[in-house]
Design a protein with these regions (language model features):
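Conserved class I S-adenosyl-L-methionine
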Residues: 106-116
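A short glycine-rich, Lys/Arg-flanked "PGG" loop and its adjoining helix->strand segment in the class I
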Residues: 187-202
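Conserved SAM-binding motif I beta-strand of class I
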Residues: 130-135
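A conserved beta-strand element that flanks and buttresses the S-adenosyl-L-methionine
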Residues: 172-175
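Conserved SAM-binding loop of SAM-dependent methyltransferases across substrates and taxa
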Residues: 117-128
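Conserved SAM-binding strand-loop segment of SAM-dependent methyltransferases
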Residues: 148-163
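Short, glycine-/aromatic-enriched active-site segment of Class I SAM-dependent methyltransferases
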Residues: 31-34, 203-228, 232-234
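N-terminal juxtadomain amphipathic helix
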Residues: 2-85, 250
């Protein structure tokens, strides 16, 4: 572990206020979702601070220390969406429900931020939509593309959105599943979403819910990938400040 591998953020990711209070301090740990080979088990692994902070201005809960995302997501990232039958069934139902709920017209562009192996986009593709994934996990993105789900192996942000809108046109729907808890610069992501969307476009995101973490004692969800633990009120304020109107919450 070197100081260049991580840093301590001193402002809230949602409201950018500096009124942060540390509320949980766990033992420093190595990053999760990194499976070791047999010959690596005895080798020392870098550990990083794991501390949860509360924003006394907007009430958002978040990690303070940010590990370089290239360490977390581009070096042997192992989580693959299609390995969970429950999640696959959820995404299949989700795609059908969103098409029906919002009367999405076939042939238009649907993009998924953090698309993983393309499981979600595959179900939209089966309904006749053009699809495009963006995911920084290079090996997984390549697997998705090999399976017919075009996937850009990169991080998403405003600059990437400018390029994609120019090259591919506006998106009618942008989705993200359990991704916005993983991103340090949330403003850059949302600016990118707002720029890439068509005038009548939709952004649908799924995020973990802090209330569940608290009530069900899901302490194991606190690790370096999960920078944010969302609740509705702070998130509504954040999205509104970026020009997005929230029309439905489940």
């Amino acid at each position: 572990m070197t100081s260049s591998d991580f840093y301590l953020r001193d402002t809230c990711r949602l409201c950018e206020n500096n009124k942060l209070e540390r509320v949980i301090e766990l033992t420093p740990t190595p990053p999760g979702n990194y499976v070791l080979r047999a010959d690596e088990v005895e080798e020392p692994r870098p550990s990083y601070p794991l501390e949860v902070y509360f924003c006394n201005d907007c009430a958002h809960v978040q990690l303070g220390h940010v590990v370089d995302p290239r360490i977390l997501f581009q070096r042997r990232y192992t989580y693959v969406s299609s390995t969970s039958p429950v999640f696959v069934a959820h995404l299949r139902e989700y795609a059908s429900a969103m098409i029906k709920r919002f009367s999405l017209g076939k042939g238009r562009l649907i993009a998924d931020i953090g698309s993983n192996d393309g499981t979600c986009l595959r179900f939209f593709q089966e309904h006749g939509f053009e699809v495009l994934g963006i995911d920084p996990a290079t090996d997984i993105a390549r697997t998705a593309s090999d399976r017919g789900i075009e996937t850009i192996p990169d991080f998403f942000g405003f600059k990437k959105a400018q390029y994609l809108r120019k090259e591919r046109g506006p998106a009618t729907l942008i989705t993200s599943h359990n991704v916005l808890a993983h991103i340090d610069d949330l403003s850059d992501i949302i600016k990118g979403v707002e720029h890439w969307l068509d005038d009548d476009g939709l952004f649908i995101m799924e995020v973990g819910y802090l209330v569940d973490v608290y009530q069900k004692v899901w302490f194991d969800t606190i690790y370096h990938e999960h920078l944010d633990y969302h609740t509705l009120t702070p998130l509504l304020g954040f999205l509104g400040r970026h020009g997005l109107e929230v029309i439905e919450v489940e």
